[in-house]
Amino acid sequence: ASQSFPEAKVWGDQSPIHTFYLPYINKVFPRARYMHLLRDGRDVVSSMVTRHGDDYLFEAVLRWKTSLKRINRFQKELTPERYIEVRYENLVREPEPTLQKVCEFIGIDYTQRMLDYWKLPSTIEHKYKTFHQNLGKPVFDSSIGKWRERLSKQQQDYVMKNLAVELHELGYLDASDG
């Protein structure tokens, strides 16, 4: 981050693997603020299976569930000034007010240009990498609920059997979800 934007006063990293190292990161950066970008676990699992193949279903379910537990345990140690939860669905459906809330949390001014991230040269160079191909596009919400199309009935049943409690607690289940 510091190489691409040397003037940056705030930097971040969104690697999900960091959920395994939160206590250590907190020791190194004791004033760090944490934003949990929460997404429907079914869509997360669906995305991972699409990327890694059908054999990854078990691992994807386990990773989402384990990461969620680790984040929930860790955030209890933080003051409200150091932790914010943002729903992915809110970010893509209502990007401006959600981003304003995030900016307030991290202590920077919101600008309309932030929604034009996909036009930045640093974004353009990454959008050609398969994993980051959507960086070159404006915010879109068509990936919400994609699990219904991407996962087979058998896969959906497995996901629901293993994530129903968490999905319910987070408010992701409704009457149509059985």
Placement of each model-derived feature along the sequence:
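Acceptor-substrate binding/catalytic loop of class I
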Residues: 58-65, 92
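Short acidic donor-binding/metal-coordinating loop in glycosyltransferase active sites
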Residues: 86-89
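Surface-exposed, flexible loop/turn segments at secondary-structure boundaries
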Residues: 42-43, 91, 122
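PAPS-dependent sulfotransferase catalytic domain
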Residues: 1-55, 65-80, 84, 162
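PAPS-dependent sulfotransferases, especially Golgi type II membrane carbohydrate sulfotransferases
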Residues: 49, 57, 68, 72-76, ...
